[in-house]
């Protein structure tokens, strides 16, 4: 899989305990300075890591977590962000070269070399990470186009967005808007 792991940072550490009180199937459990963290695998096989820490190095493995009382009105996480994505790539040097042209994404995309036929297939072939949409403050589309070179697939005629593909065939959509990042999966 192209998507190695989604790392989610929650605003309220206590909410992680509320989630754990529901006794989900977890693959790893940790204790950090702010509270507990855990890793789980989605039905689609995606690994999701949930934490509230400023520094992941502060996490220590746990065998189990005490169950807490969950407020009746707790429905789920109230506020969280995708901290970063671990993306599996077939050729680490090639992927690093591509992403070195996009320093604003360095905090979001952590590359790791892996093996597998599915790491370079098109989005329509497999259920996996297919697109990362980056909304920026108004930008000069020609500057981004020049940085990305031949990887650019489409430039909107009004210059408000462009689409490029990384070496793993993940589409990167750059759109003039609000400095946000969206992640999509293809079925």
Language-model features: where?
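Glyoxalase I/VOC metalloenzyme domain signal
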Residues: 1-33, 41-187
